[in-house]
C-alpha cells in the first residue's frame, strides 16, 4: 500500500489501521 492511498482514504483507513490512521490524520492536519 502506498502512503498516497492511505491519505486518499482516511475514512476507512483508521478503522483498518488505527495506528496508521491516527498518524495520517496528524499529517493531514499539518497540510501535507
Swiss-Prot record:
One function term, GO molecular function aspect = toxin activity
Answer yes or no on keyword Transferase: no
Q: Give residue ranges for the propeptide.
A: 1-10, 19-32
Alphabetically ordered keywords of this record: Toxin
* Superkingdom of the organism of origin: Eukaryota
UniProt cross-link Cyclopeptide (Gly-Pro), position: 11-18
Known InterPro entries for this protein? Amanitin/phalloidin
Keyword Secreted found: no
PTM summary: Processed by the macrocyclase-peptidase enzyme POPB to yield a toxic cyclic octapeptide. POPB first removes 10 residues from the N-terminus. Conformational trapping of the remaining peptide forces the enzyme to release this intermediate rather than proceed to macrocyclization. The enzyme rebinds the remaining peptide in a different conformation and catalyzes macrocyclization of the N-terminal 8 residues.
- Main role? Probable toxin that belongs to the MSDIN-like toxin family responsible for a large number of food poisoning cases and deaths.
Please report which protein family the annotation says this sequence is part of: Belongs to the MSDIN fungal toxin family.
This protein is called: MSDIN-like toxin proprotein 1
Please spell out the taxonomic lineage of the organism that makes this protein: Eukaryota, Fungi, Dikarya, Basidiomycota, Agaricomycotina
Gene designation: MSD1
